[in-house]
């Protein structure tokens, strides 16, 4: 008799995605981060749901309600700490997941990759509106500065900003709508994740060698389900460690002060996971130019498949491209460091050099190196 999981209309879908999914034999630990992102998303939605039960989206009580959650709600301090630090882990997994896709040429699955880039933008938007909710100093001023960037849009900019604010400044209407968006967006992300997986399972997973693995596949369960489980344990342990021992390590001290429109913090900066994009934004001394650079720093990922010139898929056997890849990683770290620094010499010029290198790697150096490596293969 055929198992119920193979015949039941609903269970069959889950079975084909999680149990009997043919998976390349040789995928490494870098392929764990997709499932880790799923775990992060579920963790964030569950902790967020419990926080939303006690949070009030009103400027007079928002800050106090967060204090109330930490002091009076059963394990409220833990739920908030996991939610705040879970966002950091979400982005760590996200950046590693994208880096894996770049390194092994997974971006050649066009639909999966492009949906992934849209997911990246949605997660960034969710994190940004969520950061505003505790209504601390950096929350307020971060919201003011970032939403103000839209005023750089020609002709409709100022109207657009007032429309998003719901008034002439970041105020109660802004906080209320940001809470609504922060609650809604994760569910849109879930829908996009399902699409992401749908397109991935049309082609099957890529593998470290970049070769067609169809002749050498094994079922996802029990092999990779157990491997994922180990990843879950490591990540949850690391998250617990951070949330319990250093819950404020990655936060901004300014957020311990309630939002005050009359006092500007000395250095306005976003959370650490946005600093690289913030550095690119600041490296252009023109408002519209900076906004476009900020936008293209993410959208440049969409042109990666178009600019793929190599005859090999991944970077496993392409040492020069590997060197460029690690240069990109180092460049991202430099940009992250610069994003958190004040706008003064020598940080300005370092940020500008790092920004030029960032776009050069994607748009010029990777494609040219691919062509040169093809030539080298012909000569050998």
Curated annotation (Swiss-Prot):
A ubiquinone binds at residue 201. Component of the ubiquinol-cytochrome c reductase complex (complex III or cytochrome b-c1 complex) that is part of the mitochondrial respiratory chain. The b-c1 complex mediates electron transfer from ubiquinol to cytochrome c. Contributes to the generation of a proton gradient across the mitochondrial membrane that is then used for ATP synthesis. GO terms for molecular function: metal ion binding; ubiquinol-cytochrome-c reductase activity. Heme 1 (or BL or b562) is low-potential and absorbs at about 562 nm, and heme 2 (or BH or b566) is high-potential and absorbs at about 566 nm. Heme b b562 binds at residues 83, 182. Keywords: Electron transport, Heme, Iron, Membrane, Metal-binding, Mitochondrion, Mitochondrion inner membrane, Respiratory chain, Transmembrane, Transmembrane helix, Transport, Ubiquinone. One of its GO terms (cellular component) is membrane. Heme b b566 binds at residues 97, 196. This is Cytochrome b. The keyword Zinc does not apply. It is found in: Mitochondrion inner membrane. The lineage of its organism: Eukaryota, Metazoa, Chordata, Craniata, Vertebrata. The cytochrome bc1 complex contains 3 respiratory subunits (MT-CYB, CYC1 and UQCRFS1), 2 core proteins (UQCRC1 and UQCRC2) and probably 6 low-molecular weight proteins. It holds the Pfam family Cytochrom_B_C. The keyword Electron transport applies. Binds 2 heme b groups non-covalently. Belongs to the cytochrome b family. InterPro entries: Cyt_b/b6_C, Cyt_b/b6_C_sf, Cyt_b/b6_N, Cytb/b6-like_sf, Cytochrome_b, Cytochrome_b_C_euk/bac, Cytochrome_b_N_euk/bac, Di-haem_cyt_TM. The chain crosses the membrane at residues 33-53, 77-98, 113-133, 178-198, 226-246, 288-308, 320-340, 347-367.
């Amino acid at each position: 008799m055929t198992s119920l999981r193979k015949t039941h209309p609903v269970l069959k879908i889950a079975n084909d995605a999680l149990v009997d999914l043919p998976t390349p034999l040789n995928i490494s630990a870098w392929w764990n981060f997709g499932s880790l992102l799923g775990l992060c998303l579920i963790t964030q939605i569950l902790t967020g749901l419990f926080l939303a039960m006690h949070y009030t989206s009103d400027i007079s009580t928002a800050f106090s309600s967060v204090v109330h959650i930490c002091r009076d709600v059963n394990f409220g301090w833990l739920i908030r700490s996991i939610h705040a630090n879970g966002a950091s882990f979400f982005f760590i997994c996200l950046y590693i997941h994208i880096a894996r896709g770049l390194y092994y040429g997974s971006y050649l699955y066009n639909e999966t990759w492009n949906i992934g880039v849209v997911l990246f933008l949605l997660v960034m938007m969710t994190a940004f509106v969520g950061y505003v909710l505790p209504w601390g100093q950096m929350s307020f001023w971060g919201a003011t500065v970032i939403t103000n960037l839209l005023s750089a849009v020609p002709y409709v900019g100022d109207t657009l900003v007032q429309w998003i604010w719901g008034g002439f400044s970041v105020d109660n209407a802004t906080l209320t709508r940001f809470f609504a968006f922060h609650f809604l967006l994760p569910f849109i992300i879930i829908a996009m994740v399902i699409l992401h997986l749908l397109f991935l399972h049309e082609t099957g997973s890529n593998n470290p060698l970049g070769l067609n693995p169809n002749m050498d596949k094994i079922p996802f369960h029990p092999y990779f389900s157990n491997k994922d489980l180990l990843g879950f344990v490591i990540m949850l342990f690391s998250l617990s460690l951070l949330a319990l021992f250093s819950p404020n390590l990655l936060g901004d001290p300014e957020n311990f002060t309630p939002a005050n429109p009359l006092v500007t913090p000395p250095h306005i900066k976003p959370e650490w996971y946005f600093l690289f994009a913030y550095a690119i934004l600041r490296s252009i001394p023109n408002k519209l130019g900076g906004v476009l650079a900020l936008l293209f720093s993410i959208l440049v990922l969409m042109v990666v498949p178009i600019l793929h010139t190599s005859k090999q898929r991944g970077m496993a056997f392409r040492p020069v491209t590997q060197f460029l890849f690690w240069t990109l990683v180092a460049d991202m770290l430099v940009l992250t460091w610069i994003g958190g620094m004040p706008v003064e010499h020598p940080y300005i010029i370092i940020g500008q050099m790092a920004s030029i290198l960032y776009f050069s790697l994607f748009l010029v150096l990777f494609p040219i190196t691919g062509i040169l490596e093809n030539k080298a293969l012909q000569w050998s």
